[in-house]
């Protein structure tokens, strides 16, 4: 690799001085290095050391295969780097494919908030931004895409960072126009759109008959462009289902856009859905695409459709019927090709009868209904679901975690009114209370409003005289009542409730019970 002039200590603030220094060193690399691969490696190193950018990557476009391949990558070495030779992105696929097809920069303020990010390299920090810019090429067709991740979250600097990367892309465009992929795959290698692992059908855990039937429907639905209405209680995983349908469908390489129908007042809905032209209203300083345009060619997920107003329903019905729309303040009719997946926890049939939901919109949406069973209807699935969720929590926390068989059996005694979301919250709460990496019964705490049917360990005696205990009390009140009954002696109260001392101590701490009464 070309040795670049020394420029003092690494710059840790991305300001004008850092930009000029980085651009100067990049120009030196391009002028001194005739080998394209080595020049790109030097440029990405400059972005890391002098522009506060990590995991820089250059993907080049292969016309024969109509796909992008990874030409240069900074931040990983050895075998992991060799594996990137087989990574490909189709036009419009993921962030990189979207930058290539749209021929414009794309900024994700946080990777975790954007479903287009595919994470095929498994190196990026989900809490930080990602910036992709097209590298100019011949015939108005980008030669490839330059991608980098800022090392810190400074949303006010994203625009400046994007402009800087666009300048870098322009600098490297000339040598890249004549570049050919040095290590391209054989011509017969297919370019395939892979499903992001977090959205695969393997995320739908359960062997119960209800889940098997749901999975059979999902696999069939994913093959076609049919409108889908996902129904189920809060916390059953409706958004997860929508993700799985999209990313296992023929539209997987296109955008997946989410919109919560209850999140905005009516006066903002039209602009959010259909976009607006510059000057359409006070504050419209630029033209803005709406959710339908952003989802063109892909899928639009309309969450909480049952909460929408009559005005919103009328606007939505028009575009579903005609496939056409105009931006607010515009007179040009735009055609959009969007698959609709809607979700609700309401009984829409009752809402239609009550006049709260348009009957014609109901029939437009209810082409292929998918009903998700409540967790209480498939308690046996917890045997597989709990370890699966514990593994996810362990990955987030960066440590080893296990769950005991006894804890799983205890979880299966609860009715889970909050469904899978409540189960995951319960397990994460338990994980915080264990230092040994084992989630056991004594750190399982259910929500206060409902206790499990069998919340005690086998062999521990329950109090036989329960005249002192109001069975309508929630769990916190039951613990306080037992403590008052026993003079605030924890060991005695634990025996009265059929708990271990550790269990009651844990509940006293979590439930914020004041022990200073004695």
UniProtKB/Swiss-Prot annotation:
The processes (GO biological process) annotated in the record are: nitrogen fixation; phosphorelay signal transduction system
Where along the chain is ATP bound? 232-239, 295-304
Domain annotation Sigma-54 factor interaction: ranges: 205-432
Q: Where is this region: Inter-domain linker?
A: 433-475
Q: Which residues form the GAF domain?
A: 35-176
Q: Which residues bind DNA?
A: 490-509
Name the keywords, alphabetized. Activator, ATP-binding, DNA-binding, Nitrogen fixation, Nucleotide-binding, Plasmid, Transcription, Transcription regulation, Two-component regulatory system
Q: Which GO terms describe its molecular function?
A: ATP binding; ATP hydrolysis activity; DNA-binding transcription factor activity; sequence-specific DNA binding
Matching entries from PROSITE patterns are given as:
SIGMA54_INTERACT_1, SIGMA54_INTERACT_2, SIGMA54_INTERACT_3, SIGMA54_INTERACT_4
List every stretch annotated C-terminal DNA-binding domain: 476-518
Q: Which SUPFAM superfamilies does the annotation name?
A: GAF domain-like (SSF55781), Homeodomain-like (SSF46689), P-loop containing nucleoside triphosphate hydrolases (SSF52540)
UniProt-listed NCBIfam families: nifA
Task: Describe the function of this protein.
Answer: Required for activation of most nif operons, which are directly involved in nitrogen fixation.
Q: Report the PANTHER family cross-referenced here.
A: PTS-DEPENDENT DIHYDROXYACETONE KINASE OPERON REGULATORY PROTEIN-RELATED, TRANSCRIPTIONAL REGULATORY PROTEIN
**How is this protein organized at the quaternary level?**
Interacts with sigma-54.
Spell out the protein name for this chain: Nif-specific regulatory protein
Organism, as annotated: Enterobacter agglomerans
